Structure formats: structure tokens, C-alpha cells
Amino acid sequence: MCNCSKGKYYITTPIYYPSGNPHIGHCYTTVACDTIARFKRMQGYDVMFLTGTDEHGQKIELKAEEKGVTPKEYVDEIVANFKRLWETMGISYDRFIRTTDDYHVSAVQKIFKTLYDKGYIYKGEYTGKYCTPCESFWTESQLVNGKCPDCGRDVIDAHEEAYFLRLSDYADKVEKFLTETDYLQPKSRVNEMVNNFIKPGLEDLCVSRTSFKWGVPVDFDPGHVVYVWVDALSNYITALGYDNDKYDDFSKYWPADLHMTAKEIVRFHSIVWPIILMMLDLPLPKHLYGHGWINFNGQKMSKSLGNVIDPFVLAERYGSDAVRYQIPRDMPYGSDCNFSNEIMIGRIHTDLANDLGNLVSRTVAMADKYFGGTLPEEKKAEPIDDELRTMAAALAEPVSKLIEEAQLSKALEEIFKVVSRANKYIDETAPWVLAKSEENMPRLAAVLYNLLESIRICSGLLFPFMPKTMPKVWEQIGADESMTAYDTLGTFGVLPQNVTVHKGEVLFPRIDMEKEIDELNSLLTPAKTIREDEDLDKANVITIDQFAEVKLRSGEITACEKIKKAKKLLKLTVDDGRNGRQIVSGIANWYQPEDLIGRKIVFVANLAPAKLCGELSEGMILACDAGDNDVRVLFLDKDVPNGSTIR
């Protein structure tokens, strides 16, 4: 229980647009925020964790019309699914806001009127392009191949009377805010915002619409509704009671300590939102973290591609904690991550079942077998103990810093270094050999105590990531609530010397990887292949900047072998013109190892490393679906130098 001795901490997800049911992409942001919120509570902060739904806009109005229901009826059903998912995933939000809530609607009307009265909002005519799915206005010059630069979809002509927000008046101030503070993270996003949106000339923002009705009415000008972004962004303060009497803790929690959002809406949170707050003379939030996208098998998740992952399926099959672990584990700081069924199963099998689960079960089982569950007071230390004890005792500090910086993948990496070292320590000390001699029992007790203490520290730091599983670990290793408090996690030796363990259920059952991947493939919709008669222009379009993020290189396969545990996978050693790398590829059904050695291939060089069937994979080779269940690798000419950039 938090004693709230450290002050306040206010963290927010974006509020999600309920035009369709939630998917794994929504889970990342919410799980990440929940992890940080839980960690800050452990540290003693009074945490306010806000999430919710952004329910207005033309897209919702059109979707409801298609279904023959009112917009409110349409969003009510989907919002219920969001809340059900957050309950399934163990999300500990403190407040859930809906932009259709009466208190929020009235507060937005007051905010809009205040900005108008101050002269920051003026009436004019809007002529340009509009993307309905993104709820975004664009000029002709901002389009990419005539499409929305954010989502690649078609835009429509828009011409209507509208109110505008004078963003242009604040261009210099918001640029200074972005460049002279650490508000926007990672720092690479600052250059994107300044160079792409501010320096070319920050244009005033259209903040009302007359062509649809589903929105917050502009109460002093009937026919206008407040444009969705002013409505949505204001949730961060209205949910605390700003300009309403629903809540009264605005002065307590504002400014926000961390806004977290996906990169496609960073510009609204880094430019529009600070400007609105400046206009209202309100303090600016402290930090904004714009994370990358979750791609499925290398493609951005999209309902039109049929590759949206249902998190309910994953949570039901593997438990919510396994999903909570895998998503942040494979999301590099600020970059996109690649999700695949193989990666998901690999993490559960290798990290959770083999490494963590096996460490706990082996240690508890040995304590139970050799000492009846209770360790003796007498112990004998040896120098070989020092490295594990030192690593475990020093773990909390770097992990805390990384979580504070939203670098969750690196935080987990640090924790699992100690888990790995503890497993190695078992092999080094061989408790089963020590148990054969009565005179070695004090030494055996010391070994098992060191393992239990290492598990205590690791599980304490893992609790924010896996809040349902770690209490089960504590019960098995004999740790009560006081022994897993944050302040104890930097100290080695907190468990009583005569600690009693309790054998329990298997935390993460072992998985038949090949069988499980096949079953998961049948449960989760695979990516849709574009047929010859389909319009390629209507496929999921990306911008040139997005494409530039994918680094394609040439390489030569110098060695290749099958992986015993997986019939579909080959382990490739690739000369990439630098230090070489290992890539695991699911092409064993179509190629023999000897067919590939010496061949030149194209591979993705900046894909986050992942373990597949226990083997490190540092990239992805390019191959083509040739139809009729046939896959062909893309080979290059022999004279292409290894490591060449593919353009």
C-alpha cells in the first residue's frame, strides 16, 4: 500500500477513439502506463493514472449511421469492451474519462469560450483537405501522393465556415519549449516536430466543424461543434476538475508528469496542447513520450490488412501477465517493434517458462527436498557467491531509472540479466551434489538462500510488469509484503535466514512451440494478401519518412542449419559487411540449409533482436509469398558487396 510520502505523480494514456474494438496496439500504451503507475506507487507516490475514450467526430457519426444506431449507442458498446480489456489486463487506472461525460462537455464549452474571449479563436472559412479516419485537416502541399500523410488514406475536399485557433502566434514559444526542455521524448521527435511542422510555418488550426453534428456544441454559435482535438486534449485537465465541479484535484495533480502516446499523434500533444495551455495561462506538462508502432510480421497493424491482433485471445490463452511482459519487452525505446506469433511464443517459452519460471520452481523444489521447506540458520558463504549477490543488490537503481525514463524494454533486460545469472549460479554450485554430503549442508543452505534472495529482488521489480504472477512467487519463496516493499529491493539479505518456502503451481507452463504457433496462427487473423484485382493504391500506404526508418541491407549466408525444436525454422549466419549476425527465418519448409549457403540476400538490419526457440535473431530476410503455399527468398547478384544499402 502506498504511503504517498513522495508527492504526486500524474500519468496519462491518450484517450482512445472507439471506432472499433481495442487491439494489441491499444494494450501497449496502457500496459506501459500501468507499469509506470504501479512502480511509482511502490516508490511511495500519490499516483493519478488517467485513461479514457475520445468519442466524438465525423467518423463515429458515419459508423453509427451505417449500423442504424445513435452515435452514443455505438460508442457505449465499444467503450464497454475497452473497459473489459483493461480489467482483463489488470490495468489499475484511477480515473476513466469519456468525452461524452456531461462534466467534460460543459468544461470544453467553457474552455472554447475562454479562448474565443481572449482573441485566440476567430471565425473564418476553411478550404482544404480533410482525413475522416484521422480527423485531420491538411493543405494540398502537405499530402503525400494525394493521400493523408499520417495514415495514407484518401482525403476529401472540405469547405465550410469554421473557427480557427491562432497557433501561428505561438510558433516561436512552442519551438523554444520543445528545443530548450526535455518535454518531448525521445529527443529525435523534437527535430521531427520543429522541422516538419513549425519551421515551414505553423498554420492556424481549424477548431470547429459545421458539416456534422456529433461533437461538443459551440454554445454561443449554434451549428458549430468543437473540433475533436480541442475536445480530446482538454480531457487531461477536465478529468481533474478544471472548469467543472465533478472533481476538485486539479491543483493537486496538474501539471502532468507524463503524457504517453503513439508517435502519430505526437504533433498534437507536442505543439497544439502546449499552445492551448499557454493561452489558458496554465502550467505545461513535464514530459511527453511518443512511442513507436507495433507491427505484425513487419507490417503496420491495420484492420484493412486483416492483421489486427485480438488481445483477449492472447490473455485467455497465456494469461494477461505474459502479454504484459512480451509487449514492452520487445518495444525498443522510441522505435517500432515487430510482433509475430513466433516472437510471442518465444518470449513465453524462453524468458518466462525456461528462465524465470524454472528458476523459481527449481529453487523452491530443492529447498523443500533437501531441508523440508525451511532453511537452517547455519550457512557457509564462498567467493563464488559474490557476483550474484552484488548484481542482485545493485539491480533496483538502474531499473528504477529506466522505468522513470519509460525505457521498459531495457529495464526488463536488466532484471533478466540477474535471472540468467541466478540460473548459471545453480549450474556452478550444483546443489544436488552438495546435498549428497551432510557436511556440505551449510553450504547448500547458503546457495539456496542466495537464490531465494535474488528471486525476491527480481520479482519485486517485476511486480509492476506482472502484478498477478509475482505475488504467487512471493508466496512460494516465503516473502511477506514487508519483504517486497520498494525500499527493500536494494538490500540483499532481507528474507529471514530460516525462511520457509511453499511449493506452488507452475508459474508459466512449458510450451510445445511449433504446435502452439500453428494453433495461434489459426486463432489470430493473418495478414491479408493483396490480390491482383485489388487496387494497390488502396493498400496500407506509408510516407517516405516511414519507409526510411526501415534499413535494408545486403548480406551473404555463410552458414545455415536447422533448429531441432522447430521444424519450420532455419538458423542463418549472415555476413553483413560488418561484424556478422545471426538471423532465424521460417523458411525450412521451402529450403534446405545447403541450398542457401553462399547466396546473397536482403535483410532488415534495424529490426529489434528477438529470441526464437532460444536462438537469437538479429534481423529478417525478405521473401515473397508466391502463392499455392510457396515462399521464395529474394536473392541478389553475386557481385553486390555485403552490407550494401538497399534503396
What are these model-predicted stretches?
Residues 123, 330, 335-338, 343-381, ...:
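Helix-rich, typically C-terminal accessory recognition domains appended to large enzymatic cores
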Residues 2-51, 103-107, 157-369, 411-415:
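Structured secondary-structure scaffolds
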Residues 118-171, 175:
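Cys/His-rich short segments
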Residues 473-546:
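Intrinsic disorder at enzyme termini
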Residues 80-92:
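A glycine-rich helix N-cap at a beta->alpha junction
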Residues 528-647:
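Phosphate-backbone binding interfaces of nucleic-acid-interacting proteins
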Residues 2-78, 97-112, 117, 134, ...:
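N-terminal catalytic cores of NTP/NDP-binding nucleotidyl/phosphoryl-transfer enzymes
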Residues 89-98, 116-129, 141-142, 156-158, ...:
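Short secondary-structure capping/junction motifs at helix and strand boundaries
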